[in-house]
Amino acid sequence: MAMVQPKSQKWRLLATHLLMFTFIAMILFPLLMVITISLRPGNFATGSLIPENISWEHWKLALGYSVVSPDGRVTPPPFPVMLWLWNSVKVAFITAVGIVTLSTTCAYAFARMHFRGKSTLLKGMLIFQMFPAVLSLVALYALFDRLGEYVPFIGLNTHGGVIFAYLGGIALHVWTIKGYFETIDGSLEEAAALDGATPWQAFRMVLLPLSVPILAVVFILSFIGVITEVPVASLLLRDVNNYTLAVGMQQYLNPQNYLWGDFAAAAVLSALPITIVFLVAQRWLVSGLTAGGVKG
């Protein structure tokens, strides 16, 4: 026997689908516009959503190849986009690994150990994290200018300095991982201790394998945050060859010459590392959500 839905429920279902499709369109439209601009001849930001003529000149320049026009004029790549992309991936990956490592060990101490001032430290970390990084730019510049005199590889205009600056923003990740650790039954580590495991072995062989989903989330959030970060990187990096892609892309928007097509191609390239990392870590994210739903 077929079920008959009330008319009011049908309208609610229709409204839900309309809102969902509208939301998806709002997300996809800017992406389609950027892709269209990258495939449109010339460096124009306006035009039809579907280009009449498709040109690969902007993609060739972004990938480091020269473009030869019909009149024989050779246009070399204006900027080292692929080098910037490599710098972004390198800095983001090292930073994300460092953040996961530091956050995990700190979160373990706060979740499993008892010491004086723990609550004050946790609250203090959270309060300091609430202040935007822009407020500390002057202090960061002075700090890394002085550090560079003693330790050159973490001074100004170095990727080490940028990574070191990013590693300071772990407070929210510590809170996130700490909360996840507290949902794991401590009796598992106690059982490992009865079998002769040291606290470090229990942490490494019991707690960490059970925490892979949240570690994947922290890694992805850290990776995306570094890939898209501009203020700190633009302050500390001076040499064009040391730029990350997010910083270097500003060179396309010179007031005398806006290279919108080249900018759009570089913007699409900047999304590739984020997409790849998300696809690789997707199974851990899904398993984490599923496990959370089962455990309640």
Swiss-Prot record:
Cysteine pairings via disulfide bonds: none
GO MF term (any one): ABC-type maltose transporter activity
Periplasmic compartment residues: 36-88, 144-152, 229-257
Spans traversing the lipid bilayer: 13-35, 89-111, 124-143, 153-175, 206-228, 258-280
A GO cellular-component term linked to this record: plasma membrane
Main location, first listed in the record: membrane
Domain ABC transmembrane type-1: 85-281
Subunit structure: The complex is composed of two ATP-binding proteins (MalK), two transmembrane proteins (MalG and MalF) and a solute-binding protein (MalE).
Name of the protein in question: Maltose/maltodextrin transport system permease protein MalG
Gene that encodes the chain: malG
